[in-house]
Every structure is written in C-alpha cells, then in structure tokens.
Amino acid sequence: MISYGKQSINKDDVKEVSKALRKNLITQGNTVEKFEIHLSKKLKAKFCTVVSNGSSALNIVAKTLEWSKNDFVLTTPISFIATSNCILNQGATPFFVDIDKDTYTLDPYKVESILKRNSFLRKRVKALISVDYAGHPSDWQFLKYLSNKYKFTLINDNCHALGSKYNDDTGYAVKYADIITLSFHPVKQITTGEGGAILTNSKMFDRRFKSLRSHGVFKNQDLIKKKGIWYQEFKELSSNFRMNDFQAALGISQLKRLNKLIKKRKK
C-alpha cells in the first residue's frame, strides 16, 4: 500500500532533532536562522522566512501585498484549498484560469487571452499565483512576460517542486517570481512535520514577512538601544506563525539529502 503522506526519517534526522532538543532555546533560535540560510542558498534567493506551515506562508504573502475587496488574483483551480483561501482571507477574489493538459500547471496562453478580452479584470488583477504542480515547473518565462506587461505580482506556490529544474536550473523560482512559498508537510519532498517558507529577493517584502510571522512585531534598533533589549512595538494585527528550532533541525538534515528523497519518490 502506498501511503498518502509517509515521511522518510533516518538516523541523522533523529540525531539532529535530539541535539536541538538539548539546547537551552527550542523555540525560534539560531537553528531557524541556519535553516533559512540553507534554503536561500538552495533556491538562490537573497531572503528566506521559515514559518509554521505552507498555508501560513501564503496568508502572510497575501497580507503583505494588501489585497482587498475589489482586487482579483489569478490562480489555478488544481491545487490544495490554501492557494485560493489566502486570497479570500484578504477579501479579494480568486479568478481561476485553466491548466495545461500535459503539465497540469497554469496555462499562460489562457491567462493572456483572458486579460486581453476582459478589461474589467485586467484593471483589477493584483497578482498571479501559479503552482508547480507535482514538481512540474510552470511556463515561468511567459508568466514573467505577462506580469511585466500587465503589472501584477508573480507568486510561485512551489510547495510541490523543491528540487525541480526549469531550464536545467534548480534555482529557477526566484529568477521569475517575486515571491516563492514552500511547504514541509510529510507529503512534500522534505518535511519538518509541519512547516513552510517564503523566499524573495526583495528586502522590503522580507522585513514584512518576518514581522507578520511574529504577531506583527516591529523592532527599531535605535529605540532598543535607548529603552532596552526587550523593547518592541506591534504595529499591525497578525499572529504566531513561527517555526521552532527542532523542526528547523529536521529541515536542515532533510535538505542535505533532498536529491535522494526525490529519487526515492520517483521509484
């Protein structure tokens, strides 16, 4: 019987998690930061924010981009509900575009056709979320062309595709998309039990992602120097979307054998 979401855990994984559990800090510590660095290098992105799960990643992105009632976001109908829910949670409207029959990814030619014909939609599209379904990269060159032409933010829901190649490049995602989201649920290529990540080359986005990950906290270094290390401000409504250190330790260990895990899945 083939399990829906059977994780692959080896002795190294157990060893690294055990080490993390013996540390003084097991919540969000330096292992989380190390995992972010490893993911950034793997996907050739400047910035990474790891979070509690892939759905949290999408919701943080949606809140960062400030979608609202009159906005539309183009996306695929073939995905887990979190992809469209992040749009609805912000009060915006998901507009489903059909998929390519061979790759099951968003069909950019249909995107172009819809935007050409529908001026109402064209004026209100704020973003496009494409899922690299079952590890198959979308036609990112064409999608990037469309995002530049019609001025919308391009988001890669890369939860199925960590380690995939586009034009023979595993770091393709950040070359084309403005923002990339990942999931580390057991059904994905690597797991942290639950977990997710957001990657970008935008420093402005990254600052917002990290703030929203932790209750909307804002830390001004000048004020911290004046008032003390514990001084912080909360400037917008959010919640706790943090990953803990022993999850991050598992993620680092799993990432080291990503290629082996992908080969195992292909069998």
PLM feature spans:
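Hydrophobic residues in well-ordered beta-strands that form the structural core
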Residues: 75, 96, 154-156
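Active-site region of PLP-dependent enzymes
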Residues: 161-169, 176-267
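Helix C-cap/helix->beta junction micro-motif
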Residues: 90, 149-150, 267
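Active-site phosphate-binding strand-loop segment of PLP-dependent enzymes
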Residues: 102-192, 197-205
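Phosphate-binding glycine-rich loop
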Residues: 25-72, 86-88, 95-98, 120
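N-terminal "arm"/small-domain region of PLP-dependent enzymes with the aminotransferase-like
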Residues: 1-25, 30, 233-235
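Conserved coil-to-alpha-helix start sites within the AMP-binding
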Residues: 79-84
